[in-house]
Amino acid sequence: MKSLFSYLVIFLLLFIYSSKHELKYKDTFEPVFSTYKTDSAGTLAPVEKDEIFYGLLTPVEICAIFNRLGVPYNNATLNPTSNRDQYLSSSKASINTGIYGVDFGYLKMFGIGQEMINYMVTIRDMSNKLGIPDNFLTEPIKRIQADMSEPDTIMSLMNDAFTKMEDHLRAGGRESTAGLMVMGGWVEAMFIATQLVYNPAKPDPEVVEKIAEQKYTLTTLLSFMKNYYDDPVVVYYTKKLKFLKNYFDTFDIYFKKGDLEIDRSKQVFRSSGSEMTVTVETLNKIRDYVSKLRTEMVTP
């Protein structure tokens, strides 16, 4: 099993080749949204292909997607660090550790400052509630406070810290705690994307594409969560995610024949574009349900 940080957001698609979830190729139909360039077919020049993650996304990968989409700075969207003392149960602490991890990755996009340090300290405090030694994060915090000039180094330090956190949980037979952290991170990534870059009045096809592609990631997440059905909290939130999946199941994503590549080692599809049958009404339902679910998660 890879590190928790590696499995985090977006997210091992176990049923990608089954008939129910098979990849669809373009036939005769009218797409609602398309990200294919008009000159992407029939030209001699090679077309650069975008990557579609179908595995569980890391905060670094989520951050890269946010960067491409031009997500604006709005810290009011994040879960305030002041909430940390109110998460008393292990399940709430687990979920919000994942949420704070994605918030940290989001803040990293806009430079390094005290706010970013505050989220690191919060993640450390939350992990303490889970019985994780605070030195996993204390040392990275000290190093970052001493030298805040290298953003990539910061993410590497945080990656190492989360790896140690996951190893500690696994060694103690607490895999379900790691599962809840993964889930919290994915929901937070969806919340930020649907709140800050999705505009229902004038939807950007590339933004719509990234949200729609999460139907693959959600399938992966549900398969991942199945491993921890001995935890009633996991069962509870899995039911919530299955309800959300109903909205994703109402539309299809199509690729042109010969255009799609699958890299199983990196858990990505590569394509020069896609066409979707998703409607704004469905996207709004996804946005609203994610917001409702996220509110429940961050409420003490």
Language model features by range: what are they?
Residues 1-32:
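Bacterial Sec-dependent N-terminal signal peptides
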Residues 28-143:
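N-terminal Sec/ER secretory leader and immediately downstream segment
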Residues 47-52, 61-65, 180, 204-218, ...:
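Polar, acidic low-complexity tracts enriched in Ser/Thr/Gln/Glu with frequent Gly/Pro and Thr-Pro motifs
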Residues 85-92, 104-111, 115, 143-146, ...:
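Non-transmembrane, amphipathic alpha-helical segments
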Residues 98, 102, 114-117, 121-124, ...:
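Generic structural signal for well-ordered, non-transmembrane alpha-helical segments
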Residues 104-111, 130, 168-172, 193-201, ...:
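Secondary-structure edge/capping motif, primarily at the C-terminal ends of alpha-helices
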Residues 150-238:
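Extended amphipathic alpha-helical interaction segments
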Residues 224, 228-300:
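A cross-kingdom marker for long, charged
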